[in-house]
Design a protein with these regions (language model features):
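Residues that form generic nucleotide/phosphate-binding pockets
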Residues: 18, 42, 236, 286, ...
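Noncatalytic alpha-helical scaffold of FAD-dependent oxidoreductases
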Residues: 1-140, 144-186, 190-191, 195-221
Length: 348
């Protein structure tokens, strides 16, 4: 930014010269608003696109850390080395250079016996690197969660941590507010309740449940969003494969009928917002087809084969309904339709 166009042009020229001296081969500054938005969309898509490139069946892990900006270059090198050292070779690093802030994403399959132990060792090494060697921040931009809570004291020191705990206890003596998320005495909390993303459907297996799709969904906040439909589908498949809790699986299957299947518009607007184009609506249509019985399939086949006759009958039926409304009082019509809905279990 600059106070005027002339100053901005001068600053851009200086930046181009500086970048050129350091080996940059493609430098493109633009003041075109549409182009700027397009470039920002690419940047915003790093998170989901990186997650979609992970091996199927693995969970995506992401954190954001920071170091003094004057040490950013060596910090990037050390972060890359740390990720590689612990076997996270597919990890990507991006962030906000002006703040010395790095985001990194990696993946692991926590159904494997050694995955949690490897993540434990990595997390301790990450804490030592960031808060020890670089005197930086383990949570540079986003909030502390259980993956970092075990290392808050190492970053801030025992005295500051004690003050935090005392303030927390003063305002929340029963530990009801966000329990164990910011402050947690369990040194292994970061490797407990690790999330898995089991294979459920090829249409959704690359979803990282980022939620970018949710604002576009007509049923969001009414029943379930696309992200929630995917999460429930994964949990149902996990329970089905493991045989862990048949009663819970039965309840999920039953409840999903309305919340997941019946209220999905199957419009696939979610895929427009999704950085990798996941079509939750197509998945739902597939699940609907699986739940249809032989009778429903027979009716659907008949309608498809006799579309013209069915449309004629429907037009006739609507005509009869119009005539009936002129003869039968409105309260009686309402009573008839209510009775039909009750008898048909709300299918009519």
């Amino acid at each position: 930014t600059a106070p005027d166009a002339a100053t901005l042009e001068d600053e851009v020229a200086k930046a181009i010269a500086l970048l050129s001296r350091h080996g940059a081969t493609h430098i493109d500054f633009s003041t075109d608003e549409a182009r700027s938005h397009a470039l920002w969309d690419i940047r915003k898509g790093f998170f989901a696109s990186g997650g979609a490139a992970r091996p199927k069946g693995t969970a995506m892990l992401t954190e954001d850390v920071a170091a003094p900006i004057e040490r950013l270059a060596e910090f990037v090198i050390d972060m890359r080395a740390l990720l590689d050292e612990h076997g996270y070779h597919d990890a990507i690093i991006f962030g906000h250079a002006l703040a010395g802030n790095l985001h990194f994403q990696m993946s692991d399959d926590f159904s494997l016996p050694d995955a949690a132990a490897r993540f434990d060792v990595f997390s301790k090494a990450l804490s030592d690197l960031v808060s020890g060697q670089y005197k930086g921040s383990l949570k540079a931009e986003h909030g502390t969660g259980r993956a970092i809570a075990a290392f808050v004291e190492a970053e801030w020191g025992a005295k500051a941590y004690g003050l935090m705990a005392a303030i927390k206890s003063l305002f929340d003596p029963e530990g009801l507010l966000n329990p164990g998320v910011l402050l947690n005495a369990d040194p292994k909390i970061h490797i407990k309740h690790l999330k898995s993303l089991p294979l459920a459907d090829e249409l959704i297996d690359m979803c990282i449940e980022c939620g970018f799709c949710e604002p576009a969904c007509p049923s969001h906040q009414m029943t379930l969003s696309p992200r929630q439909r995917i999460a429930v589908t994964r949990e149902r498949e996990r329970l089905r494969a493991s045989g862990e809790d048949p009663e819970r699986l039965r309840r999920l299957d039953d409840d999903f009928q309305y919340a997941g299947l019946d209220t999905c518009a199957a419009c696939n607007l979610c895929s427009v917002r999704c950085p990798v184009g996941i079509e939750t609506g197509t998945m739902i249509m597939g699940q609907r087809a699986q739940r249809r019985g032989d009778g429903a399939r027979a009716v659907a086949g008949f309608v498809a084969d006799h579309r013209g006759s069915v449309e004629t009958l429907m037009r006739a039926g609507l005509g009869v309904a119009d005539v009936a409304r002129t003869v039968i009082p409105a309260p009686a019509v309402a009573a008839i339709t209510d009775t039909a809905r009750r008898i048909s279990s709300k299918r009519l």
